[in-house]
């Protein structure tokens, strides 16, 4: 079974490595080089870099095809057709495949999705699970369908959550844990396809693409909700607020349980209440107190709260804009 793998970010790399080492990988489809870092130098995708490493190791041949089309057009489809792929395996590629592309794969396509479908269909399932305070998420391998994330389920793996995960850590966990599930599906693909079950439409929930402006903190929200948002938006788009019109990124924070009634009495949300030497800078929210432990000024380094205050001694006066 000749497999074409489509993926772009680092979370796709473990699945790529598995297929390259244990199955018949005939090509890789990934996004073209893009500007990265402070200098905005053009850089290959994490998936493309991983393929080049596999070539260096001798796992893949020197002339192994890496396709990086800007558009999924007729020219790219000719390149695909030449590979004679039978199955498409996709994880976080970043583009949607139309019927003309899918017609090139006799066995169709499958997608690795980091949620327990039909919960959290869409482009940001990991942040969505953290934002919602889910206690359980997981990985789904589904058939590729015309409607996004609506394919039949070939396999699922549950991952319990403990209210400490960030999107970065949870996505990395999903990337590693998907490999045994993917091996199981690909090793017995014909039978898995026969046993595939449709999703329960009544249980479907959708998440939308995150935007930079979504990271603005609304201090009128409960502390619990803001804390989840900070974890869900790590590393991107990040959470931020403003103080005296200066943008301040909130990198890490925790719920603060030791507040006295006197401390919070008649305090408006967004007010900086002071500090706790073990927890950080204390912020009044719409319900409860948030202890901020790592902050960052624009174009500056991330700092632990004590170091941050050493460079900004007046920071504790007043509060954040709401």
UniProtKB/Swiss-Prot annotation:
GO CC terms in record: cytosol
NCBIfam families: fmt
InterPro entries on file: Fmt, Formyl_trans_C, Formyl_trans_C_sf, Formyl_transf_N, Formyl_transf_N_sf, Formyl_transferase-like_C_sf, Met-tRNA-FMT_C, Met-tRNA-FMT_N
Catalytic activity: L-methionyl-tRNA(fMet) + (6R)-10-formyltetrahydrofolate = N-formyl-L-methionyl-tRNA(fMet) + (6S)-5,6,7,8-tetrahydrofolate + H(+)
Role: Attaches a formyl group to the free amino group of methionyl-tRNA(fMet). The formyl group appears to play a dual role in the initiator identity of N-formylmethionyl-tRNA by promoting its recognition by IF2 and preventing the misappropriation of this tRNA by the elongation apparatus.
The keyword Ubl conjugation is annotated on this UniProt entry: no
Protein name: Methionyl-tRNA formyltransferase
Binding locations of (6S)-5,6,7,8-tetrahydrofolate: 115-118
Organism name: Treponema denticola (strain ATCC 35405 / DSM 14222 / CIP 103919 / JCM 8153 / KCTC 15104)
Domain of life: Bacteria
TM region positions: none
Family assignment from sequence similarity: Belongs to the Fmt family.
Keyword vocabulary terms for this entry: Protein biosynthesis, Transferase
UniProt GO molecular function: methionyl-tRNA formyltransferase activity
């Amino acid at each position: 079974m000749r497999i074409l793998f489509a993926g772009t970010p680092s979370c796709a790399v473990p699945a790529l490595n598995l297929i390259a080492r244990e199955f018949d990988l005939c090509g890789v489809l990934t996004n073209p080089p893009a500007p990265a870092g402070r200098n905005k130098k053009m850089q290959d995708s994490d998936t493309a870099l991983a393929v080049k490493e596999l070539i260096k190791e001798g796992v893949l041949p020197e002339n192994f095809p890496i396709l990086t089309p800007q558009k999924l057009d007729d020219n790219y489809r000719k390149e695909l057709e030449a590979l004679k792929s039978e199955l498409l395996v996709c994880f976080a590629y970043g583009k949607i495949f139309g019927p003309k592309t899918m017609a090139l794969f006799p066995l169709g396509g499958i997608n690795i999705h980091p949620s327990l479908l039909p919960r959290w269909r869409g482009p940001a399932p990991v942040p969505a699970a953290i934002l919602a305070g889910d206690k359980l998420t997981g990985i789904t391998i589904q058939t590729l369908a015309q409607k996004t994330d609506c394919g039949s389920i070939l396999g699922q793996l549950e991952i319990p959550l403990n209210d400490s995960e960030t999107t970065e850590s949870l996505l990395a966990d999903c990337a590693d844990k998907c490999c045994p599930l993917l091996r199981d599906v690909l090793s017995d693909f014909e039978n898995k396809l026969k046993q595939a079950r449709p999703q329960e439409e009544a249980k479907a929930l959708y998440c939308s693409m995150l935007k930079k402006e979504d990271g603005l903190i609304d201090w009128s929200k409960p502390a619990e909700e803001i804390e989840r948002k900070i974890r869900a938006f790590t590393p991107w788009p990040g959470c931020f607020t403003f103080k005296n019109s200066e943008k301040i990124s909130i990198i890490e924070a925790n719920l603060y349980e030791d507040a006295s009634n006197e401390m919070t009495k008649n305090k408006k949300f967004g007010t900086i209440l002071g500090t706790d030497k073990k927890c950080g800078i204390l912020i009044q929210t719409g319900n409860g107190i948030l202890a901020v432990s790592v902050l960052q000024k624009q174009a500056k380094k991330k700092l632990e709260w004590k170091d941050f205050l050493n460079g900004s001694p007046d920071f504790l006066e007043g509060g954040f804009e709401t």
